[in-house]
């Protein structure tokens, strides 16, 4: 999504009040989803932040059923509480079974958990046990 942060009038329930995916972001989501499908890789579960751009990414990736999870929300501008969000996410990590879970979230959340710096169109493989992170870019 182009820009920086979300507008002052941000509302989690109103996509028009949020920074959303542009054509490039939509194309990136579709391309990443297509590459994953082509590889034959499957996720046990797919979780998305409640922000509209993350939910749209989940839809455009077209990898199957997904659900929102507030533990992936952005705390960059204080729209979500950082400590609470990270507690929820770390607690969810403890519930993960065997297999791989796809998390669709924000740069600030990814960096806080993995220590990795990511840009638009990049994604991170993160091992919740070893705490190892690897950044990937499709192009």
What are the functions of these language-model segments?
Residues 94-99, 128-130:
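A short, structured loop/turn motif at beta-sheet edges
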Residues 90-91:
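Membrane-proximal amphipathic alpha-helices
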Residues 80-87:
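Short, surface-exposed amphipathic charged segments that create phosphate/polyanion-binding patches used
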Residues 111-113:
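Short active-site-adjacent structural elements
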Residues 1-79, 116-139:
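Active-site-proximal alpha-helix that buttresses catalytic centers in soluble enzyme cores
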Residues 15-16, 94, 107:
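Generic detector of bulky aromatic hydrophobic side chains
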Residues 47-48, 99-105, 109:
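Beta-strand elements within well-structured catalytic alpha/beta cores of enzymes
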């Amino acid at each position: 999504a182009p820009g920086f942060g979300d507008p002052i009038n941000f509302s989690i329930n109103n996509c028009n009040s949020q920074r959303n995916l542009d054509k490039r972001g939509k194309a990136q989501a579709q391309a990443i989803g297509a590459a994953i499908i082509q590889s034959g890789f499957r996720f046990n579960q797919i979780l998305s932040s409640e922000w509209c751009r993350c939910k749209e990414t989940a839809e455009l990736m077209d990898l199957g059923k997904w659900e929102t999870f507030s533990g992936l929300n952005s705390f960059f501008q204080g729209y979500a509480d950082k400590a609470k969000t990270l507690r929820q996410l770390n607690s969810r990590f403890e519930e993960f079974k065997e297999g791989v879970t796809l998390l669709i979230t924000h740069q600030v959340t990814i960096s806080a958990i993995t220590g990795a710096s990511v840009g638009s169109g990049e994604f991170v493989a993160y091992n919740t046990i070893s705490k190892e992170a690897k950044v990937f870019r499709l192009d």
